[in-house]
């Protein structure tokens, strides 16, 4: 087992700081009313990328930047839909993984540009399902990724929504965590991820997790997304 590269207290501090900066970025996106009708998803992504560079000097993201609007919000991360213009009454979600001084953040939120009650209902359910997942994680000390995935899907169903992804989260850490830990099923919150989530990675570091919620309303043709650190904060 390799010696961990950073003291665990420092790792926790850095991961929380990275998430705090991501939250500040998203707050500024809202304050500037950047999510607006009439622009394309890619244009908004580029504008947010420029804002992250201005605010925090961010030049890299550990995964591709995701801006999804309208029917594209039904699609999981792995899909690559054509660029879509954001409509004035759209639902939009952002999923960004900025790197702050070599530490990864992963943050996702959903925004509704109209008074549509169905879109607001889905958006408002997202943090409730996320919190239900965290509560389950906190109360089940030996929980596996597969168990938390199953619980999260059921929590979504209890709110009246479908589940839009093949995962409910993943490992996060020093960049690049995928090279440090690998991309095996056990490093995701997903079916067949059967190891206890409270464990160390191959380098001897404690595993820290992102919980991500992707709710969909297939009948009304839209979805929403919400993610942040599961075990910290």
Q: What spans do the regions from the language model cover?
A:
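Active-site neighborhoods and metal-handling regions in enzymes and metal-associated proteins
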Residues: 1-233
């Amino acid at each position: 087992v390799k010696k961990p590269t950073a003291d665990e207290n420092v790792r926790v501090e850095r991961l929380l700081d990275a998430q705090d900066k991501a939250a500040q970025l998203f707050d500024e996106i809202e304050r500037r009313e950047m999510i607006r009708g009439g622009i394309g998803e890619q244009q908004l992504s580029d504008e947010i990328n420029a804002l992250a560079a201005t605010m925090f000097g961010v030049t890299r993201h550990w995964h591709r930047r995701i801006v999804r609007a309208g029917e594209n919000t039904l699609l999981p991360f792995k899909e690559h839909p054509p660029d879509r213009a954001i409509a004035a009454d759209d639902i939009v979600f952002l999923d960004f993984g900025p790197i702050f001084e070599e530490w990864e953040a992963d943050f996702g939120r959903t925004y509704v540009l109209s008074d549509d009650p169905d879109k607001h209902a889905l958006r408002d359910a997202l943090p409730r399902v996320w919190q239900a997942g965290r509560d389950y994680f906190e109360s089940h000390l030996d929980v596996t990724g597969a168990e938390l995935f199953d619980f999260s899907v059921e929590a979504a169903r209890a709110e009246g929504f479908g589940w839009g992804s093949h995962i409910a989260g993943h490992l996060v850490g020093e960049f690049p965590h995928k090279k440090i830990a690998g991309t095996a099923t056990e490093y995701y919150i997903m079916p067949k991820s059967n190891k206890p989530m409270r464990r160390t990675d191959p380098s001897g570091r404690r595993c820290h997790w992102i919980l991500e919620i992707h709710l969909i309303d297939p009948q009304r043709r839209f979805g929403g997304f919400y993610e942040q650190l599961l075990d910290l904060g």
